[in-house]
Swiss-Prot record:
Residue span of region III: 98-176
Signal peptide region: 1-21
GO molecular function: signaling receptor binding
Function per UniProt: May be signaling molecules that resemble neuropeptides and that act by binding to alpha-neurexins and possibly other receptors.
Family label: Belongs to the neurexophilin family.
Species this chain originates from: Pongo abelii (Sumatran orangutan)
Top-level taxonomy: Eukaryota, Metazoa, Chordata, Craniata, Vertebrata
Glycosylated residue positions: N23, N68, N93, N146, N156, N162
Region (IV (linker domain)): 177-185
The name this protein goes by in its record: Neurexophilin-1
Encoding gene per record: NXPH1
Segments of this protein annotated with the region V (Cys-rich): 186-271
GO cellular component, as recorded: extracellular region
Keyword Signal among UniProt keywords: yes
Cellular localization per UniProt: Secreted
Length: 271
C-alpha cells in the first residue's frame, strides 16, 4: 500500500523549483529537490525520478474501505532534458502567437469651463404680490471667459404697475426717484462698463376675476419681458436695482450678489 502526491510548480525565472511530496513504503519521507541552475536541475530531476518513481506508481490509487485496487502500468521513456535557452525560445514563440488586444480609443478631454455660470435663475428672484399686481423677476449671470459677462433678466407680471430693472454700481443710492435710477457717477464709469445687448417685451390683456372681489371682473394686463446686458472688465461689482410703482404699492430695492461665491479673488465692498 502506498500513496503519492506530487505538486510541480514551474516558474519561468533563472531558478526552477520542483517540490515532490511522496509517502513511500520504504521510508515515508518527502524529497525536496532544489538547484540554482535550471539546466542542472532539469537533468537531476528527470534522472532521479526515472529511477525511483514511474508513471505506474504515480497513477496507482488505493481507495480506503474498498477491497479492489486499480493499478495502471504504462510504458514510460525518460524525456530529453531541455536547456534554459530552449525554454526561453518556447516562451518567446508562444508570446508571439498571441494577438495583442486592441486598445480602446479614448475620447479627447474637452474643457467645458469656457462658459461659467456665476449665478443661475434660482440664485436671484424677486416676487411681489399686491391686490392689483402679481410680479416675478428672475435673473442670472454668465461669465464668457473672455473678459466679458452677460446679465439676463426675465419678468412676468399680471396687473397694473410700473417696473424697472437696471444694473447699477454699489454706490447707487436707494431712493424713490425715477430720474436718478439709471444715472452712473463719473468715478464709477471706469469700473462699470455695461450696455443693453437684447431686449424684448410682450404684452397682452384679458378680463379675469378681481382679486379683491371675485364677484367682479377686472381688466388685467400681462407683460413678459426679457433683457440682457453685456458687461466687460475691468469691473469691481455690479448690483441689481429694482423699482416698482403702482397705485397702492411702491418698492425700491438694490441687490448686490456675493461675488466671493464664484470668484477666487475675494471682493471687499467699499462705500
Amino acid at each position: 500500500m502506498q500513496a503519492a502526491c506530487w505538486y510541480v510548480l514551474l516558474l519561468l525565472q533563472p531558478t526552477i523549483y520542483l517540490v515532490t511530496c511522496a509517502n513511500l513504503t520504504n521510508g515515508g519521507k518527502s524529497e525536496l529537490l532544489k538547484s540554482g541552475s535550471s539546466k542542472s536541475t532539469l537533468k537531476h530531476i528527470w534522472t532521479e525520478s526515472s529511477k525511483d518513481l514511474s508513471i505506474s506508481r504515480l497513477l496507482s490509487q488505493t481507495f480506503r474501505g474498498k477491497e479492489n485496487d486499480t493499478d495502471l502500468d504504462l510504458r514510460y521513456d525518460t524525456p530529453e532534458p531541455y536547456s534554459e535557452q530552449d525554454l526561453w525560445d518556447w516562451l518567446r514563440n508562444s508570446t508571439d502567437l498571441q494577438e495583442p488586444r486592441p486598445r480602446a480609443k479614448r475620447r479627447p478631454i474637452v474643457k467645458t469651463g469656457k462658459f461659467k455660470k456665476m449665478f443661475g435663475w434660482g440664485d436671484f428672484h424677486s416676487n411681489i404680490k399686491t391686490v392689483k399686481l402679481n410680479l416675478l423677476i428672475t435673473g442670472k449671470i454668465v461669465d464668457h471667459g473672455n473678459g466679458t459677462f452677460s446679465v439676463y433678466f426675465r419678468h412676468n407680471s399680471t396687473g397694473q404697475g410700473n417696473v424697472s430693472v437696471s444694473l447699477v454700481p454699489p454706490t447707487k443710492i436707494v431712493e424713490f426717484d425715477l430720474a436718478q435710477q439709471t444715472v452712473i457717477d463719473a468715478k464709477d464709469s471706469k469700473s462699470f462698463n455695461c450696455r443693453i445687448e437684447y431686449e424684448k417685451v410682450d404684452k397682452a390683456t384679458k378680463n379675469t376675476l378681481c382679486n379683491y372681489d371675485p364677484s367682479k371682473t377686472c381688466y388685467q394686463e400681462q407683460t413678459q419681458s426679457h433683457v440682457s446686458w453685456l458687461c466687460s472688465k475691468p469691473f469691481k461689482v455690479i448690483c441689481i436695482y429694482i423699482s416698482f410703482y403702482s397705485t397702492d404699492y411702491k418698492l425700491v430695492q438694490k441687490v448686490c450678489p456675493d461675488y466671493n461665491y464664484h470668484s477666487d479673488t475675494p471682493y471687499f465692498p467699499s462705500g
